[in-house]
Amino acid sequence: MPKYKDINKVLVIGSGPIIIGQAAEFDYSGTQACKSLKEEGLQVVLVNNNPATIMTDTDIADIVYIENPTVCVVEKIIAKEKPDGILATLGGQTGLNLAVKLKEEGILDKYNVKLLGTSFESIKTAEDRKLFKRKMQEIGEPVAESVTVTNIEDALKFAKNYGYPLIIRPAYTLGGTGGGIAHNDEELISIVSLGLKKSMVGEVLVEKSLYGWKEIEFEVMRDADDNCITICSMENFDPVGVHTGDSIVVAPTQTLSDYEYQMLRSASIKIIKALKIEGGCNIQFALDPESHKYYVIEVNPRVSRSSALASKATGYPIAKVAAKIAIGLRLDEIKNPVTGKTTAFFEPALDYVVTKIPRWPFDKFYTTDRKIGTQMKATGEVMAIERSFEASLLKAVRSLEIKAYGLRLNNVKAMKTEEILKGISVPNDMRLFYIAEALRRDIDIDYINEVTKIDKWFLNKLLNIVNMEREIEKNELSEEILKKAKRMGFSDREIATIKGIEEEDVRALRKEYSIYPSYKMVDTCAAEFESVTQYIYSTYGEEDEVEIHEIPKVIVIGSGPIRIGQGIEFDYCSVKALWALRDAGIKSIIINNNPETVSTDFDTGDRLYFEPITLEDVLNIYEKEKPLGVMVMFGGQTAINLTEGLVKNGVKILGTSYESIDISEDREKFSKLLKELNINQPKGDYALTVEDAKDIALKLSFPLLVRPSYVIGGQSMEKVNTLQELIDYVKHATEISPGKPILIDKYIDGREVEIDAVSDGECVLIPGIMEHIERAGVHSGDSFSIYPARNLSEREINTIIEYTERISKALNVKGLINIQFAVKEGTVYVLEVNPRASRTVPIMSKATGVPMVKLAVEVALGKKLKELGYKSGLWPQTPYTVVKAPVFSMEKLTDAEVSLGPEMKSTGEIMGIDLSYEGALYKALEGAGLKIPKKGKILLSIAERDFQEVPSLVEKLQSLGYEIYATYRTGKYLSLMGIHVNVISLDNAIKLLKDGYFDAVINTPTKGKKPDNTGFKLRRTAVEYRIPLFTSMDTIKAALNAVAKVNVNGLSILSINEYEEIQKDNVKNLVL
């Protein structure tokens, strides 16, 4: 049956900012869906408030609204755009929950908008725990003993009957938000009370724990004619009890018998048919390792994290096919774009093993509980493809960028055996390495299996890796041993470390023995049909399937897994670079290993190498492809950190040279350059030892800002206030960047400003200047940023332009550059320079209409900006305002400090755009979860250093009609100032917070980072109970200003296309 005749315009709901549990996989699927609908001749309208994604570029959808996906806003867009249908199953939980609300509030019926794909009833059945259980029982599919509760009493009653442990799963949430495993009444009360608050409908499922059973997933697809296929089976390395997003996942399943596989495959098809899901769906099972007994854990009636993994694992474009099914096409009417011959009505076959490993943010949060369970904590993930599980696993490990090139880690090696055994007894981010070390120490596999419940098949594979390590260690590196090690997935660096030699020695020996990788294609059909797309992975000892053509081509190095400090902004830049190369008539090659992103879609570049981004892997591809050169400026710190090794091996870097990159990344060299250029910088010096640091501190006095070299996201950057804090810091920083200088600056309490520019070495174009709401000292990625800057004098603006031009020319920048400044009392200081794409490139490109990445690619290929129609200086500023707001995932990270500082903590960002500044800021606050009601109760607990700012703040709050509560010390100070507020103890404040008594909390930390401190507990409680929390006086002042001045009904709801037209007219008039 052809597509629906009455659907011509479709509204797609995006998933919003990157948060733990809802990351780039939804941008990938949403982008694919928009392209898929446009292929069918439909007009696509998109709503998504995430500026960092390629999805919100006007190249992807026809009309783009960067607005908050709320019922109120989306109703206005529906009224304005009059879509025929709405597609919500590709926007993660955000899209699904919004669709449910629009349907329940009668908005879809009011405007005659059809819910496309999976029906409202099917969504309700899959998402509502009670209805889902009933449906499974109807069709004879087993579900664990459980009860849906709306209060704590019913949960306790169930526990009394069935005993512990129990698993708690809130309804309509993602990433296991608010869930957990309870082992006693106290834990049950705590988890259930939180879960009820996190659930959109105030209900949670309490079920008997199946902890230790195998967790198996099936990705299934169904069309409206009831045609069904299973796309991929996946097996979690970790047993039930660890969220699948925090588990190592392998595809296809490795330890199931054919009977077990067919049993679960049949159940999957039965379930998707019973739920009448139209499109893709993910089904999770718990399988008893001792029998054929299984239970259905849950169904996601939408494209999910696992769908993105299954898509990349098989090459089957799930989101693309799901979008076409949503508009009425059947599976046998949709062409498989990978083979170009078969239809989408076939089940992919894999002749390789895929391994996904999560990337956790614990390098940013040292105080956080590193245990993993039912609530997801990973920010991103990597995927590897190889011919065996061992090789696939080792490839994935070295893709993580955690300084692991195999399963041997020095800090684990140094542990006592009892510490290792403790480490394997509880799921945590390091357990894989603890198990390998236990095997090295001859701990019995049966014992490890008993403790971890990880299948012995996997443990024996880990033992194979450990035995190979022993073989390498004991023998000469003969051709036979080196071949065997490479076939098993060992990196040159790991082999070198085991043998105590250099990586280049292993590389040279490998070449002497003619041991080179072979490259294979992912074709969805185990080579049964020829593939027309170029989706490639490496292996050893097999036939090479990849032909090399002598044509102009360029390699773009991607940014790897999503982590704090390096998010999808860099994937946006990589994708734009691939498109710019295509427009320039040059074949583009991307190297990346992130299954969630658009850059690793099979048709984004001309050729995709799904490989680790390490020196060895990149050099192998470079030597095979022989391109014009390599672009490192779009892959964040991942790509930048490879530059030195690439240049030493004769690789041509396109864009800014390695020498210039090194000057800007090395704190000592950079400081000298600024002195030569006569550019202001904070007073400071660089230290290599604790003694150096003490001497500098004596000269500069506290507070100081300290940071290592060659890191991203302000990793390990801190403001220190005492000598002891400084000494502790230096010891830690020398581990982060060994042998590299630590910069110690006098802290400047000024406004922070940043620019992104494009330079060709002579001409420097600055699209705009962004001003941060928070003072210097809060990481730029965690600051609210305003464009155009509002509080700079003409003289300060001219100085910023002049400094940017001087630095860009001195470094001979050919491409993008990002510079951060502090401005205090009319003096402009340069804080930092990054000669690469930064996380603000996507938002500045969207705000100003300047195609920054395209220009950077053209410049790197040798063009001049003047030839491209641009001149030096500041681009005309827009007549509208854009505000970037950070978005945090703190509620998922137990014991993480939530207050702002120099080290970045946000996982994503949203954008507020409006014709007025207050309107843009109000939208940004709302999108970031910091919306303050017009009236209500506000709690203040302020650090002494900020006391002088409190009286004016309280007067403002009282004038706006808020009822003020303060903790003892803050209240006492206000009383001395003659200001009366309600005073309560910190302990009582925390209790009232849990009861939902306060509408917002303003708390500036005294020390921070100590989970035992009451202030720390106060901040954590606010975050966990979703009460707006402000830890910076600057943010709350700006927020109150917006609340006081904004007329919510007067906010402009315009598409980015309309804003672009406003700016085009503005530029035209100014140029004339």
From Swiss-Prot:
Mn(2+) 3 binds at residues 820, 832. Mg(2+) 3 binds at residues 820, 832. Residues 1-401 are annotated as: Carboxyphosphate synthetic domain. GO terms for molecular function: ATP binding; carbamoyl-phosphate synthase (ammonia) activity; carbamoyl-phosphate synthase (glutamine-hydrolyzing) activity; metal ion binding. The keyword Membrane does not apply. Mn(2+) 2 binds at residues 298, 300. Mn(2+) 4 binds at residues 832, 834. Mg(2+) 4 binds at residues 832, 834. Residues 133-327, 671-861 form the ATP-grasp domain. Gene3D superfamilies: 3.40.50.20, ATP-grasp fold, A domain (3.30.1490.20), ATP-grasp fold, B domain (3.30.470.20), Carbamoyl-phosphate synthetase, large subunit oligomerisation domain (1.10.1030.10), Methylglyoxal synthase-like domain (3.40.50.1380). ATP 2 binds at residues 707, 746, 748, 752, 777-780, 820, 832. Mg(2+) 2 binds at residues 298, 300. Mn(2+) 1 binds at residues 284, 298. It catalyses: hydrogencarbonate + L-glutamine + 2 ATP + H2O = carbamoyl phosphate + L-glutamate + 2 ADP + phosphate + 2 H(+). Its EC number is 6.3.4.16, 6.3.5.5. Residues 930-1072 are annotated as: Allosteric domain. One of its GO terms (biological process) is glutamine metabolic process. Mg(2+) 1 binds at residues 284, 298. Pathway: Amino-acid biosynthesis; L-arginine biosynthesis; carbamoyl phosphate from bicarbonate: step 1/1; Pyrimidine metabolism; UMP biosynthesis via de novo pathway; (S)-dihydroorotate from bicarbonate: step 1/3. Residues 545-929 are annotated as: Carbamoyl phosphate synthetic domain. ATP 1 binds at residues 129, 169, 175-176, 208, 210, 215, 241-243, 284, 298. Its cofactor is Mg(2+); Mn(2+). One of its GO terms (cellular component) is cytoplasm. Large subunit of the glutamine-dependent carbamoyl phosphate synthetase (CPSase). CPSase catalyzes the formation of carbamoyl phosphate from the ammonia moiety of glutamine, carbonate, and phosphate donated by ATP, constituting the first step of 2 biosynthetic pathways, one leading to arginine and/or urea and the other to pyrimidine nucleotides. The large subunit is composed of 2 ATP-grasp domains that are involved in binding the 2 ATP molecules needed for carbamoyl phosphate synthesis. The N-terminal ATP-grasp domain (referred to as the carboxyphosphate synthetic component) catalyzes the ATP-dependent phosphorylation of hydrogencarbonate to carboxyphosphate and the subsequent nucleophilic attack by ammonia to form a carbamate intermediate. This is Carbamoyl phosphate synthase large chain. The gene is carB.
